[in-house]
Amino acid sequence: MVHGMGFRDRKHLCYWGRIPKVLESQGANVFFGHQDAVGSVEGNADIIAKSLDEVLKITGAPKVNILAHSKGGLESRYLYNHGYSDKIASITTIDTPHHGSKTVDFLMRAPKWMVKVAAKGNDVWHKMLGDKHPDSYACFDILTTKTAEQFNIDNPTPDNILCQSYGFKCKGSFSDSVFCLTYPLVRKFDGDNDGMVSTDSMRWADFKGVRTSTTHRGISHADVVDMRRMRFTKKTPSADNEISDIVPFYVEVVKGLKELGY
């Protein structure tokens, strides 16, 4: 499992909430990428590569299935296209900004020195929190539509492994208080979103559609990785694109991979 930007894999505060333990209880072997919170795609891919090699050594498996959230999906794609195509069986991305963000394009119109200063300050903070090679400016840049377009040219979708993507969205500015300011901004420039990433940008390879919750909240960028450690609602879904708890979603994704022979 490969986390997104701004967080790290920690032993006592799991990025993925309840999800890993439930998957393990269902028989899955779960491991993590351990990449930096704000590392560049290239730098983080190197770290993930070391983690992947260790997983193969421990398990004796020939390949791994990658489930990646947000920017972690870009790092997983980069890894596949740079020496690890024979060690990856499938890549599943969840709310990954495959096509960048017009919102970030707008924000990056600020004076470059100002963006650089903000990035450097963020680097110092994340260095204190444990990042080995923080590079916030590279993180900002990969989210622009221009850089994302070039990234997609340089890292084409593999045609010999299973590649799929899933999307989720909020239903309004107050779907999640964490994203009450970012949701309307992204909505203005990019349309429907999860508070951070537009549903259009989430589309990649075999896109499985956009899901939301059974209530007025919808599902945010944080909800997707079970940040609150609880189900969204007890209300039973009334449509195929609705879910009431994120954990069963992951169980079904892994179950689907197993049924396909992965």
Q: What function would you assign to each model-found segment?
A:
Residues 130-175:
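A conserved mid-domain beta-alpha-beta active-site/ligand-binding segment of alpha/beta enzyme cores
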Residues 3, 45-148, 194:
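Serine-dependent carboxylesterase/thioesterase catalytic core
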Residues 9-14, 109, 236-238:
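Short, flexible/disordered intra-domain loops and linkers
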Residues 156-262:
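C-terminal catalytic-base region of ester-bond hydrolases, centering on the histidine
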